[in-house]
Each structure stands twice: as structure tokens, then as C-alpha cells.
Amino acid sequence: MAAKDVVFGDSARSKMVEGVNILANAVKVTLGPKGRNVVLERSFGGPTVTKDGVSVAKEIELKDKLQNMGAQMVKEVASKTSDNAGDGTTTATVLAQSIVREGMKYVASGMNPMDLKRGIDKAVAAAVEELKKISKPCTTNKEIAQVGSISANSDTSIGDRIAEAMDKVGKEGVITVEDGKSLADELDVVEGMQFDRGYLSPYFINNPEKQVAVLDNPFVLLHDKKVSNIRDLLPVLEQVAKAGRPLLIIAEDIEGEALATLVVNNIRGILKTVAVKAPGFGDRRKAMLEDIAILTGGQVIAEETGLTLEKATLAELGQAKRIEVGKENTTIIDGAGEAASIEARVKQVRAQIEEATSDYDREKLQERVAKLAGGVAVIKVGAATEVEMKEKKARVEDALHATRAAVEEGIVAGGGVALIRARTAIASLTGANADQNAGIKIVLRAMEEPLRQIVTNGGEEASVVVAAVAAGQGNYGYNAATGEYVDMVEAGVVDPTKVTRTALQNAASVAGLLLTTDAAVAELPKEDAPMPGGMPGGMGGMGMDM
């Protein structure tokens, strides 16, 4: 085990605070509509230019071990806020730096760090309650577009695209972000349920122009095992042929004579069928088959439920208005499932989302909810260069998270104004002793900091603007983009309540930990081993004259 360096008290804290300041100073220049760019070196390819706080924070690793510890703790604030609310990373970093900076002054003057932390926690709890009170619901397309635009660094086209996507697929719908092929942003909407499995044979295609198989008013047969013997399928195929309607078969796999017979029947026009593999793997496959069954009003033919292919009837088959099967995707439009059953299934999957432990599982479950609830929208990001594409894509993803947060918990006035207004709830607070009161003062001061930084980045005098905004009421604030004092909500400068709340809570949490740190343990830097001695010189000339 490598030797460790153990540092105590002020020496440990001051080194860690240096790291906090290095990271925060690099991140906070990006805050606000007039935030500056930060250039990030890449190990291959050109550098990345960004105004995204969390992207800057993620790149920072410091050489000094203790400084790096402090920087990593604040990096945690940024990434936690980004994970929970999708935005507010720079605000959280600015708040954390301010709480640490002010707190260190009090700790240095001999105050009890634990009481300071109690005061900080008390003030933050009161501020969060006040933020919830002044929050207003975000329901209209215009408000959603405003939130998206602000989060995407005042890019209105991104906000408009997100609002349009939410309008098409609903607030719960899945919206994904992909690289576009042109310079302009595009929006593609897939209605109904789509899953990533296509036809098993190109001979099923009946629309050569689009290279898809289209089935109008089809039956849907769902089976959780492989089908290779056509005899298993014959009874149900005969019933479907009598009904004179097409059939989509979704099974674990369809191969051998079963697939060959379906293809021959299709070519001869005896029975219009398409076979596709079931989506997903393992337990997720079972769940997705069940989703399709509920959406189409059918049942999964599975031995567990006592159903077999030979005994299947039309009653067990699902139905839909239209199904399109391409090379890689299958889309079921307007399934015949009952609305109440679909709603119950959506509730069940939402409950699983709450309990999911991994981000991957949560994402897959959210996709299932959206497919059941009504559709998927894809925003294709357009840009002239790859560097611009990466930067813009990151902004679109941030804006998307922020708009979801706004729909969830509502919106407050942006530009740091909501935090200034929430200070009113703290002003009258008192702690159990002078040290706790100092903790409350620390938070009061920190809540001005985001507005100060926005104004500073815009090249104006921060103290004057903060005093003017604090003297105002309600949504009155400073619009840094235009340099005017306006009603922030009317001007469209709004933040999701969840973003502001999460930023404040996470910043206070990590800053409190730093202030109450009394020892730090880090690996000692390794000393480079001396270079081995060189080889002795080569033999000289032999002195032989030829």
C-alpha cells in the first residue's frame, strides 16, 4: 500500500478551498446570456468550445492531491444537479463557492463549523419552501419554449423545437436528440409504438418504394418462444385467412420451414403476413411483449399462462389500425387495447421507474412509458462543423432536461431573481446561537452570488444591479441579455423551480461537508526513480590502416 499524507485543520481546508476556487472560477465565467466560452483540449481532434458548466467541470483534474479533492467535491455538486434537474450546474457551483468562501472566514475566526452547518441547513430549508411558494406551473407551449431557450444559452430555435416536440408527443413522451444531416434543426415524430426490430425476410415487403411492409387492420400474434415448425402455426393461420385480414407475428425467432411457408403464402397472396423478432432481451423482452399485448388488446401466447400456439384463437390475437414494418423498425399505430388497461400499465411502469437503481434501467422504463402513452419525437441537431454539433447537442440535451423539470415542479423568475426573492424567508430567521446565525448570513450572501456573476459576465457593475433588484418586488429583475430592468417572467427569462432548488440544496450540502472537514488523507506524490546508467561508450577505432 502506498504511503499517505495526512493533513489536519486549516492546512487541509485551505488547500481544498484553493481547488474549489480553481474549478469554480473556470465554470462560473459561462453563467448567463453573456457568459464567456471555455476551450477544452481533446486528446485527438480539435478542441471543444463550450458554455456548458458541467462539461467544463468534468474536464478539470488538478495536480495537487488536496486541491483536487476540493475540486472533485464541487464537481460532484455540478454533476448531481445536472443528473437531478438537467441544468443549473453553473449556478450550483457559484453557490457552493460562495458558501465555502464566506464559511471559511467564520471558521478561521474561531466559530464552530458544526453550528455554522446547522445554520446553513436551516436557511436552505426555509429558502426552498419559499421557492416552492413563488413557483408557478409551466403549462403553455410558450412557457416551455422560454425555459428551453434560457437553458440552451438563449437559443430560441432550440426552445421552440422542444416545445413543438412536447406538443406532439405529450409531456411524458420520449424525446431523443440525434446528430442531424443538414445545417438546420429538424423534428421527426413517430406516432404509436415503435420498437427496433424489422422484418425477418425482405420478401415480406409490399411497398417497394419505401422498402416497408404495410399491414392495414391486421391481427397481431405474440409468442415468447421460437417458431420453427409450421404445424404449430397452422390452426391460427387458417382462422386469420378465413377472416381475410393480414397478420403480424412477433416471436423470439421464426426460422426454418415456418418462415419459408409464411414467405411463400405472402408471395402467392394466400395470406398477407409479416414476421419480426420480439424486441429486447430476457426479462425486458417479456415485459415489452406484454406492453404490445396491452396496447393491441391481445395476449402473449406463453406456456406460463397456459396458452399454446396450436390452441390459439382470434380472441387471443391483438389488433391495430395500421402497422408498418421496415428493415430495422416496426411501428404499431392505433392499437385496439382498452384505454383503462393501457393507463394501468403506464402506472405500473412508472412505479418501477421510482424504484429503479440504475440510470440505464430508468431510461429503458421511461421509453416504455412513452411508447405506451403515445409516441417518440427525435430532434435532429444541425450544425456546420463537428465541434459546433457536439456543443449544440449538449445544449439541446440540457434544455430538454430543464423543460421536463419545469413541467414537473413549475417555474420561477430567472436570472438569479428567484434566489433574491427567496431571501425574504431567511431574513427573519434566527438560530440557537451566534454561530448558527452566522451560518444563516452565509446563505443570505450566497443567494446574491448567481445574479452578481451574471452581471459581472455581462460587463456591468454587480453591486448596483443587486441593490436595484433587491429593492424591487415579485418578478422584477435585470435582463442581462438586453441590459434592462424588466418583469422577468413576462420577458421570458424563467428557470425551472426544480433546477434552482436542487442547485441550492446540493451546493449547501457539499459546502457544509467542506467546512466541517478537519483532516484530509491523500497519497504522497511518487518520486520518479533515477534513470539507469547509460551503456559504456562503443569501442574506438582499431587504428588499423588498410
From Swiss-Prot:
One of its GO terms (molecular function) is isomerase activity. It comes from the Bacteria. It catalyses: ATP + H2O + a folded polypeptide = ADP + phosphate + an unfolded polypeptide. One of its GO terms (biological process) is protein refolding. Its main location: cytoplasm. Residues 526-546 are annotated as: Disordered. The keyword Isomerase applies. It is found in: Cytoplasm. ATP binds at residues 30-33, 51, 87-91, 415, 479-481, 495. The keyword Cytoplasm applies. Residues 534-546 have a biased composition (Gly residues). Keywords: ATP-binding, Chaperone, Cytoplasm, Isomerase, Nucleotide-binding. GO terms for cellular component: cytoplasm. Its EC number is 5.6.1.7. CDD domains: GroEL. InterPro entries: Chaperonin_Cpn60_CS, Cpn60/GroEL, Cpn60/GroEL/TCP-1, GroEL-like_apical_dom_sf, GROEL-like_equatorial_sf, TCP-1-like_intermed_sf. Forms a cylinder of 14 subunits composed of two heptameric rings stacked back-to-back. Interacts with the co-chaperonin GroES. Together with its co-chaperonin GroES, plays an essential role in assisting protein folding. The GroEL-GroES system forms a nano-cage that allows encapsulation of the non-native substrate proteins and provides a physical environment optimized to promote and accelerate protein folding. Belongs to the chaperonin (HSP60) family. This is Chaperonin GroEL 1. The gene is groEL1.
